[in-house]
């Protein structure tokens, strides 16, 4: 693909852009003495739609293949760094490719109902959400990234203690490696 310098998302099939990303990530890992790295694309940004980038129609697979390639390149320079990922945006869909080289994948649960308990079999939204979440567990070790506070900004946080208690029970049974909320 052709890199558009003015563009934000970058062309994932462009070697110059790929090398820029790897160099930047290596510099950040070294500067911060990170033992685990977590790289994600910018939020709500159109992706490159050139012929090479769209060769695979599965948008989620495009990201996970690209990320695996980044990880392999970074580890050539920094062999012991570990990586995590996030199932979010267009790459939250379960990809048609293996998800490789990760300690865990954080699943962004923005498709759940906060009124009903997470494992409530009568809530169709949560049944579908948990089905997808569990399927992700077949791709990589699971983690959770919550949006419980996403609609509010300081000082308007609304504590959802019953939601947190319910989630922790479910996630503990599932053996999740990590749980994180967007805020605070």
Q: Which residues does each PLM region occupy?
A:
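Catalytic-core regions of glycoside hydrolase
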Residues: 1-184
């Amino acid at each position: 693909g052709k890199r558009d310098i003015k563009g934000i998302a970058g062309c994932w099939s462009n070697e110059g852009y790929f090398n820029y990303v790897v160099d930047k990530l290596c510099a950040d890992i070294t500067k911060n003495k990170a033992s685990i790295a977590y790289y994600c694309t910018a939020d709500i940004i159109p992706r490159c739609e050139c012929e090479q980038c769209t060769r695979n129609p599965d948008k989620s697979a495009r990201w996970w293949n690209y990320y695996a390639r980044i990880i392999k390149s970074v580890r050539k320079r920094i062999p012991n760094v570990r990586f995590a990922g996030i199932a979010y945006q267009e790459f939250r869909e379960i990809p048609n490719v293996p998800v490789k080289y990760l300690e865990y994948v954080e699943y962004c649960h923005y498709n759940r109902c906060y009124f009903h308990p997470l494992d409530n079999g009568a809530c169709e939204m949560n049944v579908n959400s948990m089905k997808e979440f569990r399927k992700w567990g077949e791709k990589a070790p699971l983690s959770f990234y919550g949006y419980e506070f996403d609609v509010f900004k300081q000082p308007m946080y609304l504590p959802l203690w019953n939601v947190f208690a319910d989630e922790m029970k479910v996630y503990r049974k599932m053996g999740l490696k990590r749980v994180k909320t967007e805020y605070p």
